[in-house]
Design a protein with these regions (language model features):
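A charged, amphipathic interaction segment
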Residues: 136-209
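Short beta-strand segments
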Residues: 11-12, 97
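A short beta-strand-loop structural module common to alpha/beta enzyme folds
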Residues: 93-103
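Rhodanese-like catalytic fold shared by cysteine-dependent sulfurtransferases
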Residues: 1-8, 14-74, 80-81, 108, ...
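A charge-rich, low-complexity, intrinsically flexible signal that marks solvent-exposed coils, linkers
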Residues: 88-90
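Active-site-proximal structural scaffolding
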Residues: 76-77, 186
Length: 209
């Protein structure tokens, strides 16, 4: 069964008649549809992230964004795809290729390069590509900023930035040894980052007991 969440696009909308009517229509079409309590206004009031559209890449005929980066990812080239799929484009495609092939693949497949050493989506000073994406897309919420510090420390060997940096580095290197296929590695790492984000959001002050 298909799943859908309907939310009014009007910034002042409270998830009223239009949302509930559309959800009912979708349920009649055999979709599992829900409405967001409070609508767009409720989302904003709760200070949930809103993606800035000005840096969104061009989408393909199926509505997907396509990204390309260097093969054999470890930290950033896994963390950024996680961020994109969870907060920007859940259908995004990622192409992992040899460093010398990144630009050619980007041109041929209309893909957006990231973490390649040059271009817009790359490290800037002490900020890694993950930091750049948070800022450019307007996703600088407290949980994601906490996660960014962990990612930055693991990626740059500044393991003193947060106690969790060493753990993320160890788990990431372990995954890179477990999987020869980059997409399989990315898919396996998604749950790792899901758990780490959930800790950043809800459980940072909780103990194992």
């Amino acid at each position: 069964m298909r799943r859908a969440l309907w939310m009014c696009g009007n910034p002042s909308a409270d998830g009223g008649t239009l949302s509930r009517g559309a959800a009912a229509w979708l349920r009649d079409d055999d979709a599992q549809a829900e409405t967001l309590t409070g609508g767009f206004a409720g989302w904003v009031e709760a200070e949930h992230p809103l993606v800035r559209p000005e840096h969104l890449p061009v989408r393909d005929a199926l509505g997907r964004t396509t990204w390309v980066t260097r093969a054999r990812p470890k930290i950033i080239r896994v963390a950024c795809p996680w961020l994109i799929r969870r907060f920007i484009d859940p259908t995004a495609r990622f192409l992992f290729v040899a460093p010398t092939e990144v630009q050619g693949v980007a041109d041929r497949f209309k893909a957006t390069p990231f973490d390649t050493g040059h271009g817009f989506w790359n490290d800037r000073g002490e900020h890694c590509t993950f930091d750049v994406m948070l800022s450019a897309f307007g996703l600088e919420t407290q949980p994601l900023l906490r996660l960014a510090e962990i990612v930055r420390g693991a990626d740059t060997d500044r393991l003193d930035l947060a106690p969790q940096c060493a753990g993320l580095l160890a788990a990431s290197l372990g995954l890179s040894r477990m999987y020869r296929d980059d997409i399989a590695q990315l898919n396996a790492a998604m749950v790792l980052y899901d758990g780490l984000f959930r800790w950043c959001r809800d459980a940072a002050d909780e103990t194992h007991g």
